[in-house]
């Protein structure tokens, strides 16, 4: 996977465009997400561990919004249940191309990995097969808020009894002081990882119109409304969290 440093917002831009998962972002994405999302490596690796507890024989494991395939590869490494396969879906052609290259390289390094299919497509239009695990890793926040419940309802309908949805998202907070504190701490995290004030400000301008975070309470209420019976937060670092939702 590319190790090119993220310098996309290092120089002043006359007009900051909306953030998009284009070739420029794909090229630096591993560095960008590691330096921007506290706890990201822990979430990815443990998502595979958690999935292994819910995977059922001869079922599908979905990675929705798969980007470069980090979660897909964690699923393939940790799940050993007979007959499982992974379907990774992303709507960015650049991401899908690099994801396929990365996973093909992993196939040559590891034996007995789960089979995987990488699809370029819109997860809102996806026809789900019966699934035991669905991963939505920092994906829902980029979907229009009024389309989130319908997607989660369809995921719930596709889940086999005993399956699980694992949902990771950036959070907003209803309490203004709590929101301000965790926002400031997140900025401090990015500074500590080498981002300048200019980079932080321009990235914020680029992403604020395309990423709409929810509060933990909103996530819980929406998941219950979608038909899930149990919602358990299993990880949080600053304003980033991951939940397990059970049917």
UniProtKB/Swiss-Prot annotation:
It catalyses: prephenate + S-adenosyl-L-methionine = carboxy-S-adenosyl-L-methionine + 3-phenylpyruvate + H2O. One of its GO terms (molecular function) is S-adenosyl-L-methionine binding. CDD domains: AdoMet_MTases. Its EC number is 2.1.3.-. S-adenosyl-L-methionine binds at residues 40, 65-67, 90-91, 122-123, 137, 204. Disulfide bonds: none annotated. GO terms for biological process: tRNA wobble uridine modification. InterPro entries: CmoA, Methyltransf_25, SAM-dependent_MTases_sf. Keywords: S-adenosyl-L-methionine, Transferase. It comes from the Bacteria. Gene3D superfamilies: Vaccinia Virus protein VP39. Catalyzes the conversion of S-adenosyl-L-methionine (SAM) to carboxy-S-adenosyl-L-methionine (Cx-SAM). PANTHER family: CARBOXY-S-ADENOSYL-L-METHIONINE SYNTHASE, TRANS-ACONITATE 2-METHYLTRANSFERASE-RELATED. Homodimer. HAMAP family: Cx_SAM_synthase. Belongs to the class I-like SAM-binding methyltransferase superfamily. Cx-SAM synthase family. This is Carboxy-S-adenosyl-L-methionine synthase. It comes from Pseudomonas fluorescens (strain SBW25). The gene is cmoA.
